[in-house]
Amino acid sequence: MESLVLGGDLGGTSTRILVVGTDGREHGLSTGDGGNPISRPAGAAAALGDALQRALAGVDPGQVQASVIGVAGWSALRTPVVAAQFAEVWADAGLTCDPGYRSDLEVAFAAGTPEPDGTVLVAGTGATAGAVTGHRLTRTADGHGWLLGDDGSGFWLGREAVRAALRSLDAGEPHGRLAGSVLAALDAAGTADRGRDRVIQVVYSHPPVQLAALAPLVSAAYHDGDPQARSIVERAAAALLATVGRVREEGQGTPIVLAGSLTRDTPVGATLRTLLSARFSGPILPARTGVGGAAWLALAALDPALATPATHSRLCR
């Protein structure tokens, strides 16, 4: 009976499960709803359980000999009540091996490189960086959430865009590209007083993290040459650079893996890569599919000899 391994990536927006053989060949794959065990433990456990059931539909769960699952907010799994919820869905899926829950930073790093040591930055709705040694997270910076940190994140960009629009209203200035697009998105066109009141009303009527939805407006205005957008992009990239600098020493030649929507083909991502190249040595690599990185780490957990560069290339396309 062939041994299989399972990789998982449980994030706030989606959950992915991948089951592969020892050669990296796919035996099962599923994608479903996301969930964070810190904010929605029951929902996160249910999302994981559903994804597990579908990924394992065509295989014997008893064949799965090792697993690694990256979890955003994985520290919540140390809480007995949350751990019990996750243990229940794991057992219901017929799995008997250890789930191998890990920080999503470790999985993101493995999704970008087979190297054991280096630095990873995840910048999407939130932002956090980590130092990785021997494929395990040893230090972190930021990731403190929208109220206390996540500097340079999608939330941060959205908040700065709204603040720029409010300053424009306060000053009675003609609206630039960024301010105009923010006011339109918030249905806050009109007089300065009406605009300010409407912006405040709309923003405070939604969860704060939803400000991240305005981040693309910053990118669009940047491409149109808006000076406010340019300033926000430059400050965001500088903040992310500083976050990396808190976990990485200058002179290290190990890889820097970038994950998350902001690090891709965006003005912040491009500016950040320029800043990183100027300050640090070592290759700057994009994270590929997170679930592939998790499956590759699961192969290493089963037998380090299986976690080859070839299987990494197959899984992390």
Positions of PLM-derived features:
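N-terminal loops that bind phosphate or other acidic moieties
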Residues: 72-75, 123, 224, 268
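Short glycine-aspartate micro-motif
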Residues: 5-9, 66-68, 100, 118-122, ...
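Glycine-rich phosphate-binding loop of actin/hexokinase-like ATP-binding domains
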Residues: 116-168
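Short beta-strand-loop/turn "lid" adjacent to the catalytic site in phosphate-handling enzymes
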Residues: 36, 55-93, 100-101, 110-114
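A short glycine/serine-rich beta->alpha loop
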Residues: 37-38, 73-74, 143-151, 280-285
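Glycine/charged-rich beta-loop-alpha catalytic/anionic-binding loops adjacent to active sites
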Residues: 88-95, 137-145, 274-282
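Conserved phosphate-binding catalytic cores of ATP/NTP-utilizing and phosphoryl-transfer enzymes
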Residues: 1, 92, 96-120, 137
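ATP-binding/phosphotransfer module of carbohydrate and carboxylate kinases, centering on a glycine-rich
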Residues: 1-63, 111-119, 162-317
